[in-house]
Amino acid sequence: MNEAFDCVVIGAGPGGYVAAITAAQAGLKTALIEEREAGGTCLNRGCIPSKALLASAEIVAQIRHADQFGIHINGFSIDYPAMVQRKDTVVRSIRDGLNGLIRSNKITVFSGRGSLISSTEVKILGETPSVIKAQSIILATGSEPRAFPGVPFSQQSPRILCSTGVLNLKEIPQKMAIIGGGVIGCEFASLFHTLGSEVSVIEASQQILALNNPDISKTMFDKFTRHGIRFMLGASVSSIEDMGDRVRLTINGNIEEYDYVLVSIGRRLNTENIGLDKAGVICDERGVIPTDSTMRTNVPNIYAIGDITGKWQLAHVASHQGIVAARNIAGHKDEIDYSAVPSVIFTFPEVASVGLSPTSAQQQGIPVKVTKFPFRAIGKAVAMGESDGFAAIISHETSQQILGAYVIGPHASSLISEITLAIRNELTLPCIYETIHAHPTLAEVWAESALLAVDTPLHMPPTRK
């Protein structure tokens, strides 16, 4: 007789494992199916390992500028294999902790590939194939790097890399090409440039970081090029050839050769061969599974979360969707709210944004005021030697409600949370500038930007005469 569960989650990434934990804590008998490692792409092949390498690169950058702080270092070397080993240790430690959390919540884990065979049955293809019954199912199958047309990622072409393979390089490339100037492409460009690689980024459009915010795109393009990263915008790659000891690219008809090529042109959704048709779940031509605000698909007892919903390809969005789905299965009436989703780019410097951009506000006909306050007027940033950059607040012109924000500069990834909370709770500018911010801190930049919006800045001249 097949084992029965209240909730079965297919995929143990940041959406799936959070959904499983939430369901189990709500008293549901829960199963979690994963064919690889707990934590999914984020923990094992994405967010965490790349940030571990970026942490090492940040120390390299600090050493190079140590003389500005009165510290003179006579020569240093980069042990890249040791950096990679540290990255692996970080991932393994977090994964071990995650497996412990799953066990402590009494979640039954099945190792294998989950596939629907009906709306209430899941087949597990693993060492010992089995079928389990499910009252409710959450699909959290994620996505994979998209390959360059006609050039699949394989061990036969170790110099043509995806975002997974690039994390396991044995050496720092002398000369590296990155196809795609989006978030992932720019993060790796920043990483390897800092480590000493000669980096070229090839982007088909006329701007990098297409976030519907031209200010971010232009500012970061200027910073990257000033630091020495080469960009080819409006460029088309027609062929990639693995020559054994190098890779040959044809770019706009011109041939260039590199040690390694990173292909970063988006991700392919994992919605094929998971039995959607057998359960009656609708999926569009892109592989997206439509859901309502409770994360329910067209089949009432089947939910979908994460990349496959076609919303935001962000781990924290997947996690929140997982919470919403699990709580609805448990009988609550939760709905997802995408009004305040923070997005972070882990480059040097960091970039973060949330809510409406000036462009999206204009497109929606919303009258807004955009105020940008520079870090060079923030004492802590100057003391840290990181005064380049700014924080911008987008507020409604009349009501002063905060509708969006973006920040380029030190610790942007952490700073964005204050404005995320403000947007989520429909706060206004006075809620920020009337709040006492600790001094000296980087967070003061938000109070100053809010004051600037009402033309009463404390640490820069007002605009009125």
From Swiss-Prot:
Subcellular location, principal: cytoplasm
Gene3D superfamilies: 3.30.390.30, FAD/NAD(P)-binding domain (3.50.50.60)
Recorded GO CC terms: cytoplasm
One GO MF term: dihydrolipoyl dehydrogenase (NADH) activity
E.C. number(s) listed in UniProt: 1.8.1.4
Record text on cofactor binding: Binds 1 FAD per subunit.
Subcellular location as annotated: Cytoplasm
Residues that coordinate or bind NAD(+): 180-184, 203, 237, 264-267
GO biological process, one term: 2-oxoglutarate metabolic process
Record-annotated active site: 439
InterPro entries: Class-I_Pyr_Nuc-Dis_Oxidored (IPR050151), FAD/NAD-bd_sf (IPR036188), FAD/NAD-binding_dom (IPR023753), FAD/NAD-linked_Rdtase_dimer_sf (IPR016156), Lipoamide_DH (IPR006258), Pyr_nuc-diS_OxRdtase (IPR001100), Pyr_nucl-diS_OxRdtase_dimer (IPR004099), Pyr_OxRdtase_I_AS (IPR012999)
Pfam family, one: Pyr_redox_dim
S-S pairs: 42-47
Keyword annotations of the record: Cytoplasm, Disulfide bond, FAD, Flavoprotein, NAD, Oxidoreductase, Redox-active center
Keyword Coiled coil found: no
Reaction catalyzed: N(6)-[(R)-dihydrolipoyl]-L-lysyl-[protein] + NAD(+) = N(6)-[(R)-lipoyl]-L-lysyl-[protein] + NADH + H(+)
Protein family per UniProt: Belongs to the class-I pyridine nucleotide-disulfide oxidoreductase family.
NCBIfam families, sorted: lipoamide_DH
Extra information: The active site is a redox-active disulfide bond.
PANTHER family: DIHYDROLIPOYL DEHYDROGENASE, DISULFIDE OXIDOREDUCTASE
Protein's name in the database: Dihydrolipoyl dehydrogenase
Gene from which this protein is expressed: lpdA
